[in-house]
């Protein structure tokens, strides 16, 4: 994964969480070292990709999909459309292809939404 491998946090200091972890003091306050989580595989759902793996997400899919992809050793992206390299506007790309190892085309994805369910009266 990419990003910060570890960070110091005050959360958990003085609790069971802190046992066995590195403890340091900064400006008179204690912090514990937390190592980042790295996933083996990150599965993301994107609207569109180019053949280089650059991805465009729609709406709230922009929230956690890029983070999931960058935190994983391998990212597999399911996309609705694959276009040629250069067809995506660079300003529209949410995740660079450097983080994507596989692209799977699903042009007609099942749209899972909540459905109204009513109790049948006997």
Named regions from a protein language model:
Residues 1-122:
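Conserved alpha/beta enzyme-core scaffold
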């Amino acid at each position: 994964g990419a990003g910060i491998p570890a960070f110091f946090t005050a959360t958990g200091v003085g609790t069971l969480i802190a046992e066995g972890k590195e403890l340091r003091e900064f400006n008179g306050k204690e912090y514990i070292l937390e190592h980042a989580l790295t996933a083996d595989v990150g599965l993301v759902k994107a609207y569109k990709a180019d053949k280089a793996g650059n991805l465009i997400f729609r709406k709230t899919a922009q929230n956690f999909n890029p983070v999931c992809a960058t935190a994983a050793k391998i990212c597999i992206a399911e996309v609705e459309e694959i276009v040629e390299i250069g067809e995506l506007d660079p300003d529209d790309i949410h995740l660079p292809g450097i983080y994507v190892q596989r692209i799977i085309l699903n042009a007609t994805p099942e749209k899972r939404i909540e459905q109204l369910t009513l109790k049948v009266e006997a």
